[in-house]
Design a protein with these regions (language model features):
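Gly/Ser-rich, acidic/histidine-flanked active-site/gating loops
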Residues: 1-12
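Short helix-loop capping/hinge segments that flank enzyme active sites or metal/cofactor-binding pockets
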Residues: 12-69, 115-128
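Short, surface-exposed loop/helix-turn segments at secondary-structure junctions
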Residues: 13, 84-103
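Structural helix-boundary/capping segments
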Residues: 55, 59, 66, 107-163
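Surface-exposed charge patches
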Residues: 70, 102, 145
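Glycine-rich phosphate-binding loop signature in dinucleotide/nucleotide-binding domains
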Residues: 73-77
Length: 163
């Protein structure tokens, strides 16, 4: 299990992301007709964040990245393999789930994805994500090449094809 110290990552990511958008898109925000409602909501959230909270969050982000890297190294795990998402993509107006993609992105770890199959019911792709530790890209690439060699066919990737 991931240590409880990392439980607040979704909020930290939201703070950094929304405040960065507020800063970098000031010109676009002066023309509200050109900005989507979801973008405006993100900006509204950013405007509730104080400068000191933003700076503190940036500082803690660097610490989180280093602490996660140390923790992952201590586990002896080379690569984490998990589903790309918890399920199908949510509708635009649905609340965003706190999925692991966001977590690993926040932690700056290398990630790669494999589409594995298309679900016969919802006709949407499903796949796997693979994650390695910070600055361990070559290990991840080597692992991914092994997966590709084992499971790739002319029709794509399929766990059942080469057992």
């Amino acid at each position: 299990d991931i240590p409880a110290a990392f439980n607040n990552i979704h909020r930290k990511h939201s703070i950094i992301y929304s405040c960065s958008l507020l800063y970098y898109f000031k010109n676009e925000l002066s023309q509200p007709d050109l900005v989507s409602e979801s973008f405006k909501e993100t900006i509204k959230f950013a405007e509730t964040i104080s400068r000191s909270e933003f700076v503190d969050t940036l500082d803690s982000h660097s610490e989180d990245v280093q602490n996660f890297s140390k923790w992952l190294s201590s586990t002896g795990v080379d690569v984490i393999v998990a589903p790309t998402t918890f399920g199908v993509a949510p509708n635009r107006d649905d609340e965003e789930l706190s999925d692991m993609n966001l977590f690993y992105n926040y932690m700056h770890v290398p990630m790669a994805y494999f589409p594995m199959w298309v679900d016969e019911t919802d006709h949407l792709p499903h796949g796997l994500m693979c994650i390695s530790n910070l600055k361990d890209d070559y290990n991840l690439i080597s692992f991914m090449k092994k997966i590709e060699k084992k499971y790739k066919s002319n029709e794509g990737y399929n766990f059942k094809s080469k057992g």
